[in-house]
């Protein structure tokens, strides 16, 4: 399946998943059980859609949606890579990483500015901070010691950056 078509389909599956999720029930189980339950829901949604996907496409959609629900979406694969020392999100579709002292473009991207804003909000809310139009810049230290700097409009002229 073509990349843009796969992304559109993944967005539809994500919407369906969100509408079916019982957050109260998920909050009562451990994270491993919650991940298994959501993975099973994604598998069920994919089979209900009856769209011809090969195994790797199904795995990619499931992995991406689990990262979206339980983590920081498209940043999760980058965060799992121990060789990456820095992640720079200049815009929704311009993500760079530092690996081995070299800056390189990453494959990661966000659906749109709103998606990037949601991920930024998830990150800064973990440390009791907020970022919005009245406070469009945040610089914070995360619990693991890493730093995060986010800028959103109106300060960021080309959309949110992280």
Task: Name each model-derived stretch.
Residues 81, 89, 94-162:
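P-loop NTP-binding catalytic core
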